């Protein structure tokens, strides 16, 4: 089995450098749901490490501009924290609600940093309020009733568009089939 570990900022910069040398123009920074201030500071240091290897393109991704387009997939944070990310060049934020069913949500996340349905639902609005230009959202199909998840996902995307004046940068719908005989667990 794979062992998880935290990469140091220099390692992250090295990985970003390798990606840019291979011609990649977009990097998605993914970090675990570490709710501690230390975890957040690591995410900021990671963004700084990526920004140290190439100029960051603000705003929308384009093939006609030089530099990196930097996006983040992190736990929900307050708007002030997203402003700190935006100041580092992060211009897109992706967050999966996982399930839009408020009755099912506590079954999937009975405790820990993801336990608040409302906090997770507010994450994309907080990102927009903090200056993140592009928002991506999704639900994990197979957890709840597909029709409910679809309608709620579209409604959430529309709400964000009305709030920000911009359509969602991405809408994801992974796992379109139920995961039969796979119990919910708190750890892999």
Residue ranges and their predicted role:
Residues 14, 20, 151-155, 161-188:
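Auxiliary Fe-S-binding modules of radical SAM enzymes
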Residues 2-14, 19-143, 165-172:
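Core AdoMet radical
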């Amino acid at each position: 089995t794979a062992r998880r570990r935290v990469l140091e900022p220099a390692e992250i910069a090295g990985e970003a450098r390798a990606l840019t040398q291979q011609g990649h123009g977009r990097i998605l920074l993914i970090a675990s749901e570490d709710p501690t201030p230390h975890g957040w500071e690591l995410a900021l240091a990671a963004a700084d490490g990526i920004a140290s290897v190439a100029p960051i393109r603000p705003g929308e991704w384009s093939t006609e501009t030089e530099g990196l387009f930097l996006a983040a997939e992190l736990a929900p944070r307050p708007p002030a924290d997203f402003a700190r990310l935006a100041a580092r060049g992060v211009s897109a934020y992706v967050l999966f609600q996982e399930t839009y069913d408020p009755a099912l949500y506590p079954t999937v996340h009975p405790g820990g940093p993801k336990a608040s349905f409302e906090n997770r639902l507010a994450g994309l609005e907080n990102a927009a309020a903090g200056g993140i230009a592009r928002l991506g959202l999704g639900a994990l199909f197979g957890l709840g009733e597909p029709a409910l998840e679809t309608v709620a996902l579209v409604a959430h995307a529309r709400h964000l568009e009305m709030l920000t004046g911009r359509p969602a940068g991405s809408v994801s719908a992974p796992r379109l089939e139920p995961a039969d005989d796979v119990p919910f667990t708190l750890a892999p």
